[in-house]
UniProtKB/Swiss-Prot annotation:
Functional summary from the UniProt entry: Binds directly to 23S ribosomal RNA and is necessary for the in vitro assembly process of the 50S ribosomal subunit. It is not involved in the protein synthesizing functions of that subunit.
SUPFAM superfamilies: Ribosomal protein L20
Organism: Sorangium cellulosum (strain So ce56) (Polyangium cellulosum (strain So ce56))
Superkingdom classification of source: Bacteria
Family stated for the protein in its record: Belongs to the bacterial ribosomal protein bL20 family.
PROSITE patterns, alphabetized: RIBOSOMAL_L20
UniProt xrefs under PANTHER family: 39S RIBOSOMAL PROTEIN L20
The protein's name: Large ribosomal subunit protein bL20
UniProt KW Signal keyword: no
Name of the encoding gene: rplT
Protein keywords: Ribonucleoprotein, Ribosomal protein, RNA-binding, rRNA-binding
Single GO molecular function: rRNA binding
Family matches, as InterPro entries: Ribosomal_bL20, RIBOSOMAL_L20_CS, Ribosomal_protein_bL20_C
GO annotation, biological process: ribosomal large subunit assembly; translation
An annotated GO cellular component: ribonucleoprotein complex
Amino acid sequence: MPRVKRGFKARRRRNRVLNQTEGYFLGRKNRFRQAVEVLRHAWEYGYISRKLKKRDFRRLWITRINAAARLNGTTYSRLVSGLKKAGIALDRKILSEIAIHDPASFGAVAKLASPAAAK
């Protein structure tokens, strides 16, 4: 089998991988095989975390809305149900932002939702 001299292409490929592992610990930053393995795992974790991020934020928004709703004498589920029945289209992200930054207007929204929830 003839010898294959890859020249600069192999070096370029290795350097591309090793540049991505800059800041990693011990051999993971300067040994090619370890760097490839670590990068592959990092990409997997990144992919998984991008999916989990959406769930985590939704849970955070619901927790914030529930806390603010309880301060206004109702619960999260009653508030969301009342908003839906009243025809108020505010998503959870916006509701949580209102609850944090403008509690008075969140209270007004909760008051609008409470009669609709009672029906």
